[in-house]
């Protein structure tokens, strides 16, 4: 029995999980999350509220800011669905990282990288809230809502990440590597420390799990949000789910593994969300205007500049990577600034444009088919790009080898 438990611990709590299975699971859970809570899996809206609360603590009156009237400032992080869900994500991330002994304080020695993290995080936060959602609400959980704005945002994000890759490869963003004499010594794992951390992770996990179940006895929505947040946190940390790497890998190495996983997750989530919409849960539809396109461009560029998206910085910061704590701070700053600038930007970029719903434009069955058709086109495009990129890379290697062989 002990051997079986040890094998389970090694295979499922310490080793990384298969990203495809994890993202599909996230898509399925996000559909249930929508059905029970009436909202989608999203994080930057709550980050914007955190910024609003911080300003209020400093004496700034944000009660007449239109953006906060749209997203709502009622309650606290402990009484809002988004708030307790995000707390659950952090609890899940730290639990999973502790199980695998993957927690280590890793400071950022280069000031240039800190500036990148702050600016990139701020651009991503600003862009996400301009588009009314980040890689979750305007992509992973936005597309299953059948909102056209999510498609605008997704395409713009892809373009933004491509531009971000080109810019971050410039010499100005490179840091000098310091070479030290002698072979580097690998730090040995302390079995006692690893075991201690594993049980601390278990305490955090079960404490939040029990709290979730207790809250469910009084509020199904809040308790279920806590439970889903815990699951989301486990999934993104153990499978290292990062939308930045999904896009960046396409442009840098041609690898499409994570991008394909995300598409599969959306395909699964779409059917679940569609079912709940047909049962009467209202879809979350946002303005399909320039705000979604500009927001996507800024978000895509920002996450590459920063090195991580919203889900990425959350789990990496829980692993002790200080760089991503700066990214998170930048996110809050950028999203809060968008709330401040919304009244000037919204009339031109958002409010004069329709909230387009594929289910209303094409009917329930037609909208579902259009959404799936677009997802299949995305999958075909990603597979084609992967093969095209790798074919070009192999041709370059073959040409280089040929030149060396002939002495050119």
Regions found by a protein language model. Name each.
Residues 1-408:
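Membrane-interfacial helix-loop segments of redox and metal-homeostasis proteins
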């Amino acid at each position: 029995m002990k051997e079986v438990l040890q094998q389970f611990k090694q295979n499922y709590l310490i080793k990384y999980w298969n990203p495809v299975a994890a993202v599909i699971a996230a898509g399925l859970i996000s559909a249930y999350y929508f059905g029970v809570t009436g909202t989608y899996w999203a994080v930057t809206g709550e980050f914007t509220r955190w910024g609003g609360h911080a300003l209020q603590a400093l004496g700034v009156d944000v009660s007449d800011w239109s953006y906060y009237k749209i997203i709502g400032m009622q309650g606290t992080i402990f009484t809002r669905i988004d708030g307790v869900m995000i707390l659950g994500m952090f609890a899940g991330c730290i639990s999973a990282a502790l199980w695998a002994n993957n927690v280590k304080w890793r400071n950022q020695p280069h000031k240039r990288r800190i500036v990148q993290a702050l600016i990139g995080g701020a651009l991503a936060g600003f862009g996400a809230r301009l588009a009314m959602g980040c890689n979750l609400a305007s992509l992973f959980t936005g597309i299953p809502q059948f909102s056209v704005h999510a498609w605008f945002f997704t395409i713009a994000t892809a373009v933004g990440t491509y531009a971000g890759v080109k810019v971050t490869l410039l010499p100005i963003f490179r840091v000098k590597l310091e070479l030290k004499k002698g072979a580097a010594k690998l730090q040995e794992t302390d079995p006692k420390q690893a075991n201690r951390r594993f049980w601390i992770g278990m305490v955090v996990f079960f404490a939040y799990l029990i709290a979730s179940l207790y809250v469910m006895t009084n509020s199904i929505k809040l308790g279920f949000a806590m439970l889903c947040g815990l699951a989301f946190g486990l999934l993104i940390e153990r499978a290292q789910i990062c939308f930045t790497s999904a896009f960046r890998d396409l442009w840098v190495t041609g690898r499409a593994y994570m991008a394909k996983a995300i598409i599969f997750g959306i395909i699964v989530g779409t059917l679940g969300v569609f079912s709940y919409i047909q049962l009467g849960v209202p879809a979350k539809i946002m303005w399909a205007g320039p705000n979604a396109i500009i927001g996507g461009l800024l978000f895509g560029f920002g996450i590459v500049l920063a090195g991580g998206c919203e889900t990425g910085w959350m789990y990496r910061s829980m692993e002790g990577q200080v760089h991503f704590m700066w990214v998170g701070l930048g996110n809050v700053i950028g999203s809060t600034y968008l709330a401040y600038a919304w009244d000037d930007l919204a009339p031109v970029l958002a409010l004069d444009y329709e909230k387009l719903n594929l289910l209303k434009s094409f009917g329930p069955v037609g909208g579902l088919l259009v959404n799936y058709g677009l997802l299949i086109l995305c999958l075909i495009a990603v597979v084609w790009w992967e093969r095209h990129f790798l074919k070009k890379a192999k041709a370059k290697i073959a040409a280089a080898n040929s030149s060396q062989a002939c002495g050119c």
